[in-house]
């Protein structure tokens, strides 16, 4: 089934009903027409309807059979109906012939109408008057038409039933009319006419049957709900809307109104129309040329009028004279103008050349004279061609010399800006007028005109792409591979693509050569540009070499910046042996016991010394730097990642502060290890060492043992294992150690935050609100230590209710201290349920 409901092998939909066809048959064989004739105009309309398949062949045959059934008793109407049937057989195509030669129609015509009512063996002349004579005449006409149809249908397998009925009647003794009753000279002529008539009828062109396919027969695009299928009325194929959008009338198929055809049929019909127009226009041109030749012929025309018997010779002579005149006019124009591009004027031909040749043409051998004139004209045209070719060769030899002279000044292009090189005065420049372009430009234009284009046109590219698409679709479809030899469109496209192969190779070779040329020119331009930039930079360095550029607002050279994260680290470690490189945690502090006041009274460290004393492996060197405000103390790890090329002015504004690397740790402390902490009396270095190695909390020095940074050499041999009283394990959140930073930090300090994947945006603000300030950490630690010692003495095995109430009264204070990590680790400490923190809305 095709789309929306018709069988795949059906013919086009009928556009006329059987009643309308019956009415037309009645009009064609009307009773008002005398002597059994038919109305030819209506009869040919009927044949066009049947041939164009506006009505099916079977319905047309049955309409004619119905007409015979209604009028078989009237000899005149029966004769006109037989003539209409014969006309339809000769003009309605092979499909209608199959229906006429069927058993249904032929048995009714022969066995019923002829044998019963118009039997020539039973009817004799003289019996029954004129009525019998008319019947005998109708019977003979039936036998005559049957004999003609047998001749027409012979050698056709599907039309054998007519020949069978013919042989049956002949065996029964019916005498058929003899078509060869004339003299023997006309026998061959009658046979040729019969064969011609048979060929014409059998080969009469009719619209083909519609074929069905699931793809367009041109582009092979499958049909769908949007891509509808359409049948071509000329070839019967199925096509998409894109390739069947043309409508033309098909007169040769009996279709007078415009109908849908495919692109191939449209091109074929359009080509035939153009050919017919060209033939008609050539006939008009020949007629005009004859009139012009008669005008120029003078006495030749009068002489040809006298010789009316030799019309063919006169026509050949006229053509010869026309060619002669055209050649002479072109030769005269070329010799008179003196230029190769001069065009002979049409108003130039005069009557003198024919007048001078009149005696020659009238006397002697006219044919020999005309041949000599033709040879002279051809020689003149060849001579003119040679002179033009020599002029072009001389002009091309002069052009290379002029082009080399014009290209020399352009080679010194980069020296134009310097007055020392007078390049323009050493080379003469060619002078050109406004009407004459430079010879190099003329040569380029002429080369572009002479060199044929090697690139493929858009139509050729589309042909290649279409061929590739079709071949890819054929590779994936085995059904198409079987029919590939019968696909005329694909074979034609293959022939076109094969012809394009040499052109494609030339185009590819030309493109490769152009690419190599352009690449070489690009390399030259890059080299010249680089050399010019170096030269210009040297000039600028020489011009500004004597001036000193201040380094206050400029950076350190690039080499120093590059060495910040590479070689400078090793050099700093060698120059500062008293500062060990630490990968994690905080730097060790060595020296004598000092207080914070003494540390603040020390002279400020210079910027160079400060940056040299910074730890090298803080773990944050790869982080990007952030700008600093003037009133905000910078973070130490932030200072460690600043480039060494920072301005001196910013270094001088920074206070001498200590470095606290590795501050970006999880903001929430770990409370799960409180029960596993060791007692206070045990050495704290073990706890510190274990907790530092695990990474849960860092080591912080107390306020009483903060070292002097300038006396680091005195404690150079100290190790973490021997420093038993310098470090205390705390569970504070990981921000700077408990130092008195009141003089260094403003009261409302906002720490500089850096981008980190492990911290929320407001981690430090939340920590400062949730935990106690740094100033009270040491004091709270001492106080808590004393309280725990007293509690351990008076503590019983089970806590009292009063202690629980006391704990509730001090819940908020204990929570802050517990979170800050200032409490000592005790083995006898019991787990106490902490109150749930309030959620800030």
UniProtKB/Swiss-Prot annotation:
One of its GO terms (molecular function) is phosphatidylinositol-3-phosphate binding. Keywords: Endosome, Membrane, Metal-binding, Repeat, Zinc, Zinc-finger. Residues 273-317, 329-371, 384-459, 558-841 are annotated as: Disordered. Residues 30-177 form the VHS domain. GO terms for cellular component: endosome membrane; ESCRT-0 complex. A zinc finger (FYVE-type) spans 210-270. Zn(2+) 1 binds at residues 216, 219, 240, 243. It is a peripheral membrane protein. Residues 314-333, 369-388 form the UIM domain. It is found in: Endosome membrane. Residues 392-411, 428-457, 558-584, 819-830 have a biased composition (Low complexity). Residues 776-787 have a biased composition (Basic and acidic residues). Residues 278-296, 417-427, 592-665, 711-721 have a biased composition (Polar residues). Coiled coil: none annotated. InterPro entries: ENTH_VHS (IPR008942), HGS/VPS27 (IPR017073), UIM_dom (IPR003903), VHS_dom (IPR002014), Vps27_GAT-like (IPR049425), Znf_FYVE (IPR000306), Znf_FYVE-rel (IPR017455), Znf_FYVE_PHD (IPR011011). SMART domains: FYVE, UIM, VHS. The FYVE domain is involved in the binding to phosphatidylinositol 3-phosphate (PtdIns(3)P) which is required for the association to endosomal membranes. Both IUM domains are necessary for efficient binding to ubiquitin. Belongs to the VPS27 family. Component of the ESCRT-0 complex which is the sorting receptor for ubiquitinated cargo proteins at the multivesicular body (MVB) and recruits ESCRT-I to the MVB outer membrane. This is Vacuolar protein sorting-associated protein 27. It comes from Candida albicans (strain SC5314 / ATCC MYA-2876) (Yeast). The gene is VPS27.
């Amino acid at each position: 089934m095709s789309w929306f409901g018709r069988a795949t092998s059906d013919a086009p939909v009928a556009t006329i009903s059987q009643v309308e066809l019956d009415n037309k048959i009645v009009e064609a064989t009307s009773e008002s027409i005398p002597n059994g004739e038919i109305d030819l105009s209506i009869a040919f309309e009927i044949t066009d309807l049947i041939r164009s398949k506006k009505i099916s062949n079977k319905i047309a045959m049955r309409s004619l059979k119905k007409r015979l059934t209604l009028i078989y008793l009237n000899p005149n109407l029966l004769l006109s109906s037989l003539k209409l049937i014969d006309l339809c057989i000769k003009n309605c195509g092979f499909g209608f012939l199959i229906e006429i030669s069927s058993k249904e129609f032929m048995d009714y015509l022969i066995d019923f109408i002829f044998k019963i009512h118009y039997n020539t063996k039973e009817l004799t002349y003289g019996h029954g008057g004129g009525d019998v004579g008319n019947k005998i005449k109708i019977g003979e006409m039936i036998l005559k038409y049957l004999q003609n149809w047998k001749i027409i249908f012979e050698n056709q397998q599907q039309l054998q039933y007519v020949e069978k009925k013919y042989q049956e009647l002949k065996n029964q003794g019916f005498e058929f009319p003899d078509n060869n009753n004339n003299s023997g000279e006309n026998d061959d002529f009658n046979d040729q006419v019969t064969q011609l008539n048979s060929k014409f009828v059998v080969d009469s062109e009719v619209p083909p049957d519609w074929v069905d396919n699931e793809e367009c027969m041109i582009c092979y695009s499958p049909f769908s709900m949007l891509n509808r299928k359409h049948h071509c009325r000329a070839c019967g194929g199925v096509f998409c809307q894109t390739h069947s959008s043309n409508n033309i009338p098909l007169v040769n198929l009996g279709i007078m109104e415009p109908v849908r055809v495919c692109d191939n049929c449209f091109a074929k019909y359009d080509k035939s129309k153009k050919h017919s127009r060209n033939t008609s226009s050539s006939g008009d041109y020949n007629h005009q040329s004859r009139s012009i030749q008669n005008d120029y012929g003078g006495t030749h025309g009068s002489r040809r009028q006298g010789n009316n018997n030799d019309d063919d010779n006169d026509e050949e002579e006229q053509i010869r004279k026309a060619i002669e005149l055209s050649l002479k006019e072109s030769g005269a124009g070329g010799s008179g103008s003196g230029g190769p591009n001069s065009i002979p004027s049409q108003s130039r031909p005069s009557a003198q050349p024919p007048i001078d040749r009149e005696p020659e043409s009238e006397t002697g051998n006219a044919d020999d004279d005309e041949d000599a004139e033709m040879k002279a004209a051809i020689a003149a045209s060849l001579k003119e061609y040679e002179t033009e070719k020599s002029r072009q060769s001389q002009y091309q030899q002069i052009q290379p010399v002029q082009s080399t002279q014009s290209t020399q000044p352009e080679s010194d292009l980069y020296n134009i800006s310097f007055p020392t090189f007078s390049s323009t005065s050493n080379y003469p420049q060619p002078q050109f007028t406004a009407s004459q372009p430079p010879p190099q430009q003329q040569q380029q234009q002429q080369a572009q005109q002479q060199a044929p284009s090697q690139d493929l046109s858009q139509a050729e590219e589309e042909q290649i792409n279409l061929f590739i698409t079709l071949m890819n679709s054929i590779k994936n479809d085995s059904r198409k591979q079987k029919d590939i030899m019968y696909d005329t469109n694909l074979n034609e496209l293959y022939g076109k693509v094969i012809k394009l192969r040499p052109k494609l190779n030339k185009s590819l070779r030309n493109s490769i050569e152009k690419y190599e040329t352009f690449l070489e020119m690009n390399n030259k331009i890059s080299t010249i540009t680089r050399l010019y930039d170096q030269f210009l930079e040297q000039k600028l360095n020489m011009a500004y070499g004597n001036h000193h550029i201040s380094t206050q607002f400029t950076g350190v050279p690039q080499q120093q910046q590059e060495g910040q994260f590479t070689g400078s680290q090793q050099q700093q470690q060698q120059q500062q042996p008293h500062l060990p490189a630490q990968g994690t945690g905080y730097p060790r502090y060595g020296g004598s016991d000092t207080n914070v006041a003494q540390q603040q009274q020390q002279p400020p460290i210079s910027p160079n010394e400060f940056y040299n004393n910074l730890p090298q492996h803080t773990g944050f060197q790869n982080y990007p730097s952030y700008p600093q405000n003037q009133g905000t103390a910078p973070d130490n790890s932030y200072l460690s990642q600043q480039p060494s090329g920072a301005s001196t002015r910013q270094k001088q504004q920074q206070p001498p502060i200590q470095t606290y690397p590795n501050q970006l740790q999880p903001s929430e402390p770990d409370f799960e290890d409180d029960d596993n902490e060791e007692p206070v009396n045990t050495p704290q270095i073990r706890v510190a060492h274990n907790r530092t190695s695990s990474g849960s909390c860092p080591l912080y020095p107390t306020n009483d043992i903060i070292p002097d940074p300038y006396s680091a050499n005195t404690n150079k041999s100290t190790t973490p294992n021997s420093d038993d009283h310098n470090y205390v394990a705390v569970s504070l959140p990981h921000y700077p150690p408990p130092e008195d930073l009141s003089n260094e930090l403003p009261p409302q300090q906002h720490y500089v935050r850096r981008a980190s994947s492990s911290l929320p945006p407001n981690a430090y603000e939340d920590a400062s609100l949730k935990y106690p300030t740094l100033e009270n950490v040491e004091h709270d630690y001492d106080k808590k230590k004393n309280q725990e010692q007293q509690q351990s003495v008076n503590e019983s095995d089970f806590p009292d209710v009063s202690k629980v109430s006391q704990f509730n009264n001090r819940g908020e204070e204990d929570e802050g201290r517990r979170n800050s990590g200032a409490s000592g680790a005790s083995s006898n400490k019991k787990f106490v349920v902490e109150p749930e923190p309030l959620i800030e809305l």
